[in-house]
């Protein structure tokens, strides 16, 4: 084993981190979509 395998910085599950990243990015784009839709409806 090398030093990186011995000294792991984070013991958390990678699936949890990837799920959080997916939800955050999806929420950001969903927020942009909602804002654009509201602006489109107000402007019409």
From Swiss-Prot:
Asked if the keyword Membrane belongs to this entry, the reply reads yes
Pfam families xref list: YqzM (PF14141)
**GO CC terms, sorted:** plasma membrane
- Segments spanning the bilayer are 19-39
Q: Which domain of life is it from?
A: Bacteria
The UniProt entry lists membrane topology as: Single-pass membrane protein
Q: Where in the cell is it found?
A: Cell membrane
* Keywords recorded for this protein, A-Z: Cell membrane, Membrane, Transmembrane, Transmembrane helix
This protein is called: Uncharacterized membrane protein YqzM
**This protein's encoding gene:** yqzM
């Amino acid at each position: 084993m090398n030093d990186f395998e011995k000294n792991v910085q984070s013991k958390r599950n990678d699936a949890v981190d990837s799920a959080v990243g997916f939800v955050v990015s999806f929420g950001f784009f969903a927020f942009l979509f909602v804002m654009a839709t509201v602006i489109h409806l107000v402007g019409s």
